[in-house]
UniProtKB/Swiss-Prot annotation:
GO terms for molecular function: ATP binding; RNA-3'-phosphate cyclase activity. Keywords: ATP-binding, Cytoplasm, Ligase, Nucleotide-binding. The active site is at H316 (tele-amp-histidine intermediate). It is an enzyme of class 6 (ligase). The keyword Cytoplasm applies. It is found in: Cytoplasm. SUPFAM superfamilies: EPT/RTPC-like, RNA 3'-terminal phosphate cyclase, RPTC, insert domain. ATP binds at Q107, H290, L291, A292, D293, Q294. It comes from the Bacteria. This is RNA 3'-terminal phosphate cyclase. GO terms for biological process: RNA processing. It comes from Nostoc sp. (strain PCC 7120 / SAG 25.82 / UTEX 2576). GO terms for cellular component: cytoplasm.
Length: 348
């Protein structure tokens, strides 16, 4: 059994999700102690518990410690990941519903299902656009297209918007099984081709997304970027608003966003998202700090070595690298000075 210290590094949920994914893929049983010890409320929250049970379900695994607030977990996979049709609902584990990010559940089970024999269809319910988590828009426009370059074939479709704190969103995920993963060489991003933006509001006046879109377009055009904005007013179970920007370079993709909240103007929400994008643009790097740690797992499972340059070497990145190496699947080297990540898969 592989013992994992959940308090290592940034002490967040990434340690748990990566461990669950690799345990399901390799069949290695794991014990995690100190789950999310670095967070204000340690232990398993609704989205983490849903991810735990989802990982166990797709491989008929056994669990101990799978409860809200638990800081200790044992997971014994049960004989290979099984492709199929699955439904995972974050609100089921927390009475009254939850906006727990379903994208974190998605990222936990995606690679195991992509490597399984047969195709899978997964319905996920909960929060689709939640602060401090990848949004479904980011998954659709950045994460999955980048993973497609590495051989992973998956599509996501947003069925209903789900914001914090209500949730109530739904996503349908299609995963092609039997994928053969290849490496990624991404040291240069090339020229910026375009920025695409989506400003959206549910159960709120139409002027809110339009103001976000107008402000973002003005800021990005002033900065000399080619931009195309779309403003949408959608139906939802609760009010919510946000703006989501995707920058397409010749060799890479990146995405940033901002969320509306009380006493924060639509224009300010747009300024926050644009500020993040412009700051990244100035780094010259092809990979943003969030995608940097998300690419590690497919890279270490690939049949070729990978290397890519990142905008920032975050604690999230180095923590995830340390967890992956616990499974003996390869060697990850992070050059802090050059901001280059090199992954030598054991399959090479």
């Amino acid at each position: 059994m592989i013992n994992i210290d959940g308090s290592y590094g940034e002490g967040g949920g990434q340690v748990l999700r990566t461990s669950l994914s690799l345990a399901a893929i390799t069949g290695e049983p794991i014990r995690i102690a100190g789950i999310r010890a670095g967070r204000r409320k340690p232990g398993l929250a609704a989205q983490h518990l849903t991810a735990v049970r989802a990982a166990a379900r797709i491989c008929h695994g056994e669990l101990q410690g799978d409860a809200l607030g638990s800081t200790m977990l044992e997971f014994i996979p049960g004989g290979g990941v099984k492709a199929g049709n699955y439904i995972f609902d974050v609100s089921e584990v927390q009475q009254g519903g939850s906006a727990g990010a379903i994208t974190l559940v998605l990222q936990t089970i995606l690679l195991p299902l992509a490597l399984a024999d047969g195709d899978s269809h997964i319905t996920l319910r909960g929060g689709t656009h939640v602060i401090f988590s990848p949004t479904v828009t980011y998954i659709e426009r950045v994460y999955l297209p980048m993973l497609c370059r590495m051989g992973i074939k998956a599509q996501v479709k947003l069925g209903a918007w789900g914001w914090y704190p209500r949730g109530g969103g739904e996503v349908n995920l299609q995963v092609k099984g039997g994928c053969q993963l290849c490496g990624l060489n991404l040291l240069e991003r090339g020229e910026l081709k375009r920025v695409q933006g989506l400003a959206v509001a549910t159960e709120l006046p139409a002027h809110i997304p339009q103001r976000m879109a107008n402000r973002a377009e003005n800021l990005l055009r002033t900065a000399g970027l080619r931009v195309s904005m779309q403003a949408l007013r959608e139906k939802g179970v609760a009010p919510g608003a946000g703006i989501f920007l995707t920058a397409e370079y010749c060799n890479s993709l990146t995405g940033f966003g901002g969320f509306g909240r009380l006493r924060l103007s639509s224009e300010k929400v747009a300024e926050i998202a644009c500020g993040q994008l412009l700051q990244f643009h100035e780094t010259g790097a092809p990979v943003d700090e969030h995608l940097a740690d998300q690419l590690l797992l497919p890279a270490v499972l690939a049949s070729e070595s990978s290397q890519y340059k990142v905008a920032e070497v975050s604690t999230h990145l180095t923590t995830n690298a340390a967890v992956i190496e616990k499974f003996g699947l390869g060697k990850i080297t992070v050059n802090q000075a050059e901001r280059v990540v090199a992954i030598a898969s054991s399959k090479v």
